[in-house]
Structure formats: C-alpha cells, structure tokens
C-alpha cells in the first residue's frame, strides 16, 4: 500500500491579501479535504503538524519510508503586485522520472478545475 508524507504549509504569518486567512490555514483546508480521498484509494499518509517548520517536516519525511512527499504551499506576490499573481506550479525532484510523472498528473487534473489552466505548470527544484 502506498504511503505519502502530506506537508501543508506551517506559515501562519503569511496572510492572504483576500482576507481569507493565512497560507497555513488555506493549505491545511486542502490537506483536510485530501485525506478522505487518500484513504478511500488505499493510500496511507503521515501529516506534518502546525508547530513544525518546512525544515523539520522534510527531516521527518526523510527519516521515514514514504513513496511520495506532497508539500502544499502558496507563494506571495512581490510588493506592488499583491493579488495580481496567479498560477500553480507542481514541483518535482530533478531527475526523478516518477516524481516528474506525479507532478504532471497533478498538473493535468488541476488544469481541469483551475480558472487559468495555461498557468498550471511543472518544474524541477531542490529548494
């Protein structure tokens, strides 16, 4: 049975310009919504905790045996462009064929529901 490490943002200080709460709040709502889908599809998961940081979440994931690491984060726009930047990037580890395939599958599904499908992309990264 596959097992993933689910890592929603822990950035409670990163408030959304729309007034809809923080990045931590919004990304945890997404993680909450994902959990029943994971379980109903036979996917086990471990989830980080709000008191953790990105670094401690990565360390915890690296100390375990997970098939996939799913980080849920959003990025802030530069000053003067608040509320103007939009899009989704599905990142994957460079050289990971399976990671790239997973990112492309996520992006494909997100294009179906995101209002700007041409702004849903994939990109390799190590940071």
What are these regions (language model features)?
Residues 2-4, 11-14, 21-127:
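Active-site-proximal helix/loop segments of hydrolytic enzymes
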């Amino acid at each position: 049975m596959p097992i993933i490490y689910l890592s929603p943002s822990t950035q409670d200080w990163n408030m959304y310009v729309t007034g809809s709460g923080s990045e931590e709040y919004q990304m945890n709502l997404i993680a909450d919504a994902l959990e029943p889908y994971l379980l109903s599809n036979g996917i086990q998961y471990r989830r980080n905790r709000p008191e953790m940081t990105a670094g401690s979440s990565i360390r915890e994931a690296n100390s375990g045996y997970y098939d996939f690491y799913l980080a849920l984060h959003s990025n802030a726009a530069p000053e003067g462009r608040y509320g103007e930047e939009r899009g989704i990037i599905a990142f994957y580890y460079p050289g990971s064929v399976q990671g790239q395939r997973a990112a492309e599958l996520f992006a494909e599904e997100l294009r179906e529901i995101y209002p700007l499908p041409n702004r849903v992309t994939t990109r390799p990264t190590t940071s």
